[in-house]
Amino acid sequence: MATKSTGGTEKTKSIEVKKKLINVLIVDDDPLNRRLHEMIIKTIGGISQTAKNGEEAVILHRDGEASFDLILMDKEMPERDGVSTTKKLREMKVTSMIVGVTSVADQEEERKAFMEAGLNHCLEKPLTKAKIFPLISHLFDA
């Protein structure tokens, strides 16, 4: 089931969006990736919630539980992959920034399909603070 983590008190610059901490949904079937992504978001002062697959992400939004500034979306997942999840969320009028996180970001056809589904940006694994911090700062003009 989905889990929630709040930002810590690390002495790093926090990313704020409109005077509030950035709220991130991490969608990934790999528990190690989810934990790594949670730790990265925490180190930049954000808060996060996780979903282990795309279906959980859709249910969170359908049930009205969701209000995220950013969704980090894995591409390859069981039950509902990142491309179909992104399409479904956009059909549901979800306006959150969606960033694809994939090991195949360098393959043009894979990246194109993911972007056409409604992504705002795509990052290649492994996700690091050095990759995500500048992107979030740029996307949200933080």
Swiss-Prot record:
GO terms for molecular function: phosphorelay response regulator activity; protein histidine phosphatase activity. It holds the Pfam family Response_reg. It is found in: Nucleus. Two-component system major event consists of a His-to-Asp phosphorelay between a sensor histidine kinase (HK) and a response regulator (RR). In plants, the His-to-Asp phosphorelay involves an additional intermediate named Histidine-containing phosphotransfer protein (HPt). This multistep phosphorelay consists of a His-Asp-His-Asp sequential transfer of a phosphate group between first a His and an Asp of the HK protein, followed by the transfer to a conserved His of the HPt protein and finally the transfer to an Asp in the receiver domain of the RR protein. Residues 23-140 form the Response regulatory domain. The keyword Flavoprotein does not apply. One of its GO terms (biological process) is cytokinin-activated signaling pathway. This is Two-component response regulator ARR22. It comes from Arabidopsis thaliana. The gene is ARR22.
